Amino acid sequence: MLAGGNVVAAANDSWESLGLDLDGSVVNLGSILEPDVEQLIAAEPDFVIASANTDADVAMEETLTQAGITVAYFDVANFEDYLNMLSICTQITGRDDLYQKNGLDVQKEVEEMKQRADGSNPTVLFLRAASSNVKAKGSDGNVCGEMLADLGCVN
């Protein structure tokens, strides 16, 4: 979406947690932890973007490859990782304008926000809640924790 192209299938959290504006033709693959690979193949994607950190995504690589579907795995833990992924995806779609708009322009805003941090280094507790648990998360290896660290928070 941010890199161009059309979404043909997505996990249910795309609607439930992320609130993405996906039209009725997008196939709901079910749980992010147990996506329905048959439904994904039936949606006939040209290209699948998957998480390198989700066991179910990694497990479906062979099946998708055998079906002739190209899969790219990403580990996005911070803004630099996001920019790298966006760069690759906009190169694939040929939409350099979207790399500028959704990458470099946003990077300027991020840098402006970092400059606004007052240096007080507040102590925070970052909790990630899911339907079955709540976990305290550190500042490394996840987008929100990295953002808090960039703003000078002690997590």
Annotated model-derived regions:
Residues A10, I49-A52, Y73-A77, L127-G141:
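Short beta-strand->loop
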Residues S25-N28, A67, T90-I92, V143:
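Short, hinge-like loop/turn segments at secondary-structure boundaries
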Residues A59-N133, V154:
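Extracytoplasmic substrate-binding proteins
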Residues M1-A43, F47-T54:
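A short, structured surface patch at a secondary-structure boundary
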Residues N12-S17, K135-N155:
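Alpha-helical, coiled-coil/dimerization segments enriched in small aliphatic residues
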